[in-house]
Amino acid sequence: MSDFPAAGSGNKRLNAIVYGRVQGVGFRFFVLQQAVALGLTGWVRNLVDGMVEVLAEGDTANLQELLAVLHEGPDAAFVRDVKFHYSVATGEFREFDIRYH
């Protein structure tokens, strides 16, 4: 079984944890811009251990595109790894925003 949902399989939820130098480098704002441009809803936040968590819902293809840019990040970031999984979208979000715990 693949970690990627089949294209055209409707809305899904992506939960990702981004590891590396991802705090203090504009990573959350970068994710916000990308997610809004892709029409996704959800949030991004810093974790106390230095990682960044992303929870996004939307079209499968757009989530996969967001996942690809999470591996890159903004210029000042250094992404070491991205752990992620997909699940069923709940539709609970109306927009994408930055959360502060």
Q: What are the roles of these predicted feature ranges?
A:
Residues M1-H101:
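Intrinsically disordered, low-complexity, mixed-charge
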